[in-house]
C-alpha cells in the first residue's frame, strides 16, 4: 500500500505537541504514531514530511522536520472545519529517485481520495 512508505512521527515530538493547549492547531490534527495511522477517509488535508536532501547543496543525513512541525502546530486555527492528519515522513530511499517514487505514490493516493497534500521539505 502507498502509505507503507510513511514513517510515524517521533515520540518526543508527539509529547511536545501534546503539551500545547487545546487552542492550538495541534488539537485539531490526527497524528501517525507508532501504534495508530489516521483514517484517511475522514481527512481533508494531509501533511507529509520528506526526509530527502540528496542533490541539494548539503547532503547531511541529519534532516529533522520537528522544528517546522512544532511551529506549525503552535499556531492558532481559524474558524474552519477541515480535518487534518499528519501522516509522518517519507524516509530516504536507496536512491533519490526511489524517494520521489514514494512521494509520487503517496501524493497520488491522497489526491484520489480528494485529500489535499501539504508537503514539508527542507532543501539544504
Label for each model-derived stretch:
Residues 2-124:
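Metal-dependent C-N hydrolase catalytic cores
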Amino acid at each position: 500500500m502507498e502509505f507503507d512508505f510513511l514513517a510515524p512521527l517521533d515520540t518526543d515530538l508527539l509529547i511536545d505537541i501534546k503539551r500545547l493547549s487545546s487552542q492550538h492547531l495541534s488539537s485539531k490534527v490526527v497524528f501517525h504514531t507508532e501504534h495508530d495511522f489516521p483514517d484517511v477517509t475522514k481527512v481533508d488535508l494531509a501533511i507529509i514530511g520528506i526526509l530527502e536532501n540528496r542533490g541539494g547543496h548539503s547532503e547531511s543525513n541529519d534532516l529533522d522536520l520537528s522544528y517546522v512541525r512544532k511551529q506549525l502546530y503552535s499556531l492558532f486555527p481559524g474558524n474552519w472545519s477541515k480535518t487534518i492528519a499528519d501522516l509522518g515522513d517519507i524516509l530516504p530511499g536507496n536512491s533519490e529517485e526511489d524517494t520521489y517514487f514514494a512521494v509520487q505514490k503517496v501524493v497520488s493516493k491522497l489526491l484520489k481520495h480528494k485529500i489535499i497534500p501539504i508537503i514539508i521539505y527542507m532543501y539544504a
